[in-house]
Amino acid sequence: MNVERLRFDDVGLALDLQVGDSAGRAALALSAAVGPQALKNTQLVSAWLKFFDEGKTITQAAQTLLDTGAMAALAGGADNASFVQLLYRNVIGQPASAATTEILLQYLDGGGLSRADLFRAVAELPVNQARIDLVGLQKTGLEYAL
């Protein structure tokens, strides 16, 4: 038996929290975009779960955030440097150094990597998995609003 979700009277619990599963992708992407504290917002988690339950990828989530301007609003600017700083701050927990920013900007500005692809790569990093305690979430589940 493979149970992905549990529903209680007041809250749901997502259990499909492997990196490739819907809830796993939602948790990693939400943390990269908004920060790990966003996983405590059950309404936000619910919206992201619905997106990924439709079979969408982290790259598609990033592209949606970019296309709607939500990523620029979160980053405080639409430029590549603001985007890099947002991801680094949310995943690592501190601003990126000038050297790190420059390296990542070379990939983005040179066309070697799209923003959506960089977002996916960063969201799936082991450091992001550790920052949100994905292993712990796999044991307890991720709460979401019904």
What does each model-found stretch correspond to?
Residues 1-2:
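Small/polar residue-rich beta-strand/coil "junction" motifs that cap repeat-based extracellular fibers
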Residues 5-146:
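Substrate/cofactor-recognition hotspot
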